[in-house]
Structures are given as C-alpha cells and as structure tokens.
Design a protein with these regions (language model features):
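Conserved Walker B catalytic segment
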Residues: 1-17, 26-28
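Short glycine-/polar-rich loops that comprise or flank the Walker A/P-loop
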Residues: 7-9, 34-37
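Conserved nucleotide-binding/hydrolysis micro-motifs of P-loop NTPases
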Residues: 16-20, 44-46, 90, 193
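Short regulatory helix/loop adjacent to the ATP-binding pocket of P-loop NTPases
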Residues: 18-36
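Conserved AAA+ ATPase "SRH/arginine-finger" region at the nucleotide-binding site
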Residues: 37-48
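Amphipathic alpha-helical "lid/sensor" segments that cap RecA-like P-loop NTPase cores
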Residues: 54-117, 127
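C-terminal leucine-rich, beta-strand-based interaction scaffolds used for sensing/assembly
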Residues: 116-200
Length: 200
C-alpha cells in the first residue's frame, strides 16, 4: 500500500462505530488487516471532567454547582458529545448560577426538542424491535437479552423473536454491542434517544 513505504509518518484511524473499525483492521479479508495497533479510549474520568467543566464556566464568570456537574456526567455517561451538548445548552441559556434543577430542566428540554425525530424511529421498527429498544434503554446495559428474567420483566416475546429483533437493531445501529469486565452487553446507540425512551 501507499502507507507502508512512508517513513516518520504516523496514521491515526478513529471512529465511533466499533463494529466497523474492528472489521476494517481485524478481518483477514480487508486490506488493513493486522496493520495497526488497536487502542480503546475509556471515558474521561469524572474527576478530570468535573474540573474541566467547572473551570470553563468560571472562565466566563458563571458558576455551576458540583451536584449539577455530577448529574450531567451521570446522565450523559461521560460521553463527550452528549456532555458537550448539555453544557453548551446550559451555557447558551445565559444563567450565571447553574444548579442541579436547571440542569435537569435543560436535559428535559433537549429530549423534548428531539421527540419528533425519536417518534419517527418507531415507524422504522417493528413492534418487537421497538419493545426491545425500549427495554434496553430502561436497563442501560443488557448482558443477557435472552434470559427469562429480562424477557418477563419487559413483556418481550420468545428468545427466537428477540434474536431477530436484536440483529435488526444492531444492523440499523439503534443499539451497539460492547464488552466490559462483566461480559458482552447491549446499549442504545444514541444516548438522548435512550434517555427519552426511559421516560416512556
């Protein structure tokens, strides 16, 4: 390839679609197979993020309470895009003193603004897919989507129908698959959609 003969040049390939990135670099059928070192970036630590947010608000003569920051980081799961979106919305509101109540209100407004888009998703999914999507959102992380406990708790169908719904949601990138120390789990891809579904 053109990359191999280049000296003193480093390439960084990044993307949020883990399945696609894994396929590009770990599949022997792909031209980039085994050509890179894979690095997974964990979320920014809550301590570092809290300090950063507080400093940015203070630089602009605004004060945000530690409780408000804590709620933002928990609600956005420290995902950079969603954290920035909430903070930018709060900042644009012009308030000089931001507490947890104003943060909760702002989060609700963000979800309300996107409700029409979220409702459109329902038309793109079958009943089983929508019910499974809601169940995954309400759980946050689902390690055993075929377990009797999960199916019963959310009044879902048979394990076979859940397998089909799960595959469809993964293909449509409505949910994603991830691995942590507890094993493989599924979560809703769009965090704002996930939080909106929790309210339903």
């Amino acid at each position: 390839t053109m990359i191999q003969p280049l000296n003193n040049v480093h390439f960084l390939f990044s993307g949020s679609n883990r399945h696609m990135m894994t396929e590009i670099f770990n599949s022997s059928k792909r031209p980039f197979f085994a050509s890179t070192r894979i690095i997974s970036l964990p979320p920014i630590s809550a301590e570092s993020y809290s300090r950063f947010i507080a400093e940015k608000f203070l630089e602009n003569k605004r004060k945000i309470s530690p409780e408000a920051i804590g709620f933002i980081l928990e609600w956005t799961r420290r995902h950079t895009y969603y954290t920035q979106s909430v903070c930018n919305t709060l900042f644009s509101s012009g308030g000089k003193e931001i507490d947890i109540h104003s943060v909760k209100e702002t989060c609700g407004e963000i979800l309300d603004e996107q409700e029409k888009t979220f409702l459109q998703y329902r038309n793109l999914l079958t009943g089983n897919q929508w019910q499974l999507l809601m169940a995954v959102a309400k759980e946050g992380k689902v390690y055993k989507p075929h377990s009797g406990e999960f199916l019963s708790k959310h009044s879902l169908g048979t394990p076979a129908s859940i397998t089909r719904a799960l595959d469809a949601l993964l293909t449509k990138e409505m949910i994603y698959e991830e691995i942590d120390s507890s094993g493989k789990y599924y979560s809703v891809y769009d965090l704002f959609l996930s939080r909106w579904l929790e309210r339903q």
